[in-house]
Swiss-Prot record:
Cystine connections: none
Protein's name according to its UniProt entry: Pardaxin P-4
Subcellular location per the Swiss-Prot or TrEMBL entry: Secreted; Target cell membrane
InterPro entries assigned: Pardaxin
Domain topic, free-text comment: Consists of a C-terminal hydrophilic region and a predominantly hydrophobic remainder.
Pfam families hit by this protein: Pardaxin
Keywords, sorted A to Z: Ion transport, Membrane, Secreted, Target cell membrane, Target membrane, Toxin, Transmembrane, Transport
Length: 33
């Protein structure tokens, strides 16, 4: 099912790029508070 796809999604380069982008956005918005 869907959960079998999760490791593939997590290991994909696109996911890592998205995750780092979200992480930097969160840290920058959190740092402004």
């Amino acid at each position: 099912g869907f959960f079998a796809l999760i490791p593939k999604i997590i290991s994909s380069p696109l996911f890592k790029t998205l995750l780092s982008a979200v992480g930097s956005a969160l840290s920058s918005s959190g740092g402004q508070e």
